[in-house]
Amino acid sequence: MDQPISVTLSSTTDPLWRSCHEYDNEMVITVNGRRIFPTLEYTVTGLDTFKLYSMCMHLDLVDDKKLRFTGGQWAESVSTEKKDPPRKVWHHNGSQTGKDWMLRNVSFDQIRITNRKSKEDGNASYVHLLTQHRYIPVLTIYEGDQLVHTARIPHSQFISVTAYHKGELNTLKTNNNPYSTGSRKDRRRERQSPVYSEGTSSEKSISPPPAKKIKDMAPALPDYSVISKPNLLQSLIFPMIAEQPSTSQSPPAPPVFPFNPDLQMQMLQPFMLPQFGFPCGFPSINPFMNPFLTPFTSMFPTPTVSPDGEGVKLEPEAFVEV
């Protein structure tokens, strides 16, 4: 006799679903779509290993009541809103054998619930829900085109809301949901908090959080004081010059002559002014032989010595009448 088909929530998600059900499980819906948490993950058994099956999920209204949270509890009233047929979301694995379906858990984590009907257009995984209504997930199994099994798990029902009303439920989901904003803040706070480690003694040491790494915008230059090769220093400071090929022989140095003060004075003698002795005030050199005073030699006749040795005789210049 063939084993009947059985559908249960997976062992990893069923305990959390039961815990949320104790607080009248609420599911937040948004305009942009929100994941269902806990995840709709099932374990299916009793399928024919060789037959082909396909599965889909839809969210069905539990009743025609609209809920309102007041006084710390939910109050019911008759819902007058229009109800559309529930939208079916097919599993992304499509059609496969019963062996493949039973090999692993069946998850519908691709479903997003929204409170805007237009979000369903062009988004196969989006499902529109009415706010403050009670829903229950329904898993349907098809063999070809024939419906063979429908599963409704009572403690998986929830109330669609735009914000949590019970703090205990909010804390429970935040601490277990990896996609929750509060859960991310808690994990970030844990990473930034000091880490306590026990050593050999009874005292506990606190290790500070790691400092932020600062990226250097420019590479650090080496210590030039330890560079012994000048060519290497030149290549670091002037890379364009270092690329030019260098010859092995340096150019010859200019000849160096010893310092000669007499030679230097002889070279500067034509440019020197006449030197006057002290205290007479007469020039110590012949002013008539100075090259700078050559224009004045025609104004002063040069004395001549007479042949008879009687002394110096000045010859008057001859004047020519014109």
Curated annotation (Swiss-Prot):
Compartments in which it is found: Nucleus
One function term, GO molecular function aspect: RNA polymerase II cis-regulatory region sequence-specific DNA binding
Biological process per Gene Ontology, one example term: positive regulation of DNA-templated transcription
Biased composition (Polar residues): 171-182
InterPro entries: p53-like_TF_DNA-bd_sf (IPR008967), T-box_DNA-bd (IPR046360), T-box_sf (IPR036960), TF_T-box (IPR001699), TF_T-box_CS (IPR018186)
Keyword Protein biosynthesis: no
Any one annotated GO CC term: chromatin
SMART domains hit by this protein: TBOX
Protein name as it appears in the record: Putative T-box protein 11
Species in which this protein is naturally found: Caenorhabditis elegans
This protein's encoding gene: tbx-11
